């Protein structure tokens, strides 16, 4: 019985050694594949965006329509990056400077619900920076993004 156990233990140790060698070989193959993948990814360039990155907005009322069109267009062609209203609002905020940036600070400090509502955020911007209501009706499609 002891001899049988010794033989069984020896067989198990041999199998363990063979599996360890196979595991090492597989790990090396995996390492090579990961390196090859990284090399291939470096060679592939992402497609260029057909819409340029929007300009910043400093609160100048006459530039608000242009700013909204630019940001809406950019978000539309990059919709995978702007999957919800909070992401869209955060993007707009990242482009605010000067008076417009100062305007948004209180909303951020009080964690206003408007920061998660793209349409409401645009409405607040329009109200603060002087957007004519007649233009609002004409440009409603641009706001929907």
Curated annotation (Swiss-Prot):
Keywords: Nucleus. GO terms for cellular component: nucleus. Disulfide bonds: none annotated. It is found in: Nucleus. It holds the Pfam family DUF4939. InterPro entries: DUF4939. One of its GO terms (biological process) is cellular response to muramyl dipeptide. Interacts with NOD2. May have an important role in the development and/or progression of some cancers. Belongs to the LDOC1 family. This is Protein LDOC1. It comes from Gorilla gorilla gorilla (Western lowland gorilla).
């Amino acid at each position: 019985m002891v001899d049988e156990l010794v033989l069984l233990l020896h067989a198990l140790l041999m199998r363990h050694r063979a599996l360890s060698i196979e595991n090492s070989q597989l790990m090396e193959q995996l390492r090579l594949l990961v390196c090859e993948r990284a090399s291939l990814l470096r060679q592939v360039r992402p497609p260029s965006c057909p819409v340029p990155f929007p300009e910043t907005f400093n609160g100048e009322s006459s530039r608000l329509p242009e700013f909204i069109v630019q940001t809406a267009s950019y978000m539309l062609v990059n919709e995978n990056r702007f999957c919800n209203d909070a992401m869209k609002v955060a993007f707009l905020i990242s482009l605010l400077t000067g008076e417009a940036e100062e305007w948004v600070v209180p909303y951020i400090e009080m964690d206003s619900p408007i920061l998660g509502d793209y349409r409401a955020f645009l409405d607040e911007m329009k109200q603060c920076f002087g957007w004519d209501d007649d233009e609002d009706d004409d440009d409603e499609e641009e706001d929907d993004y």
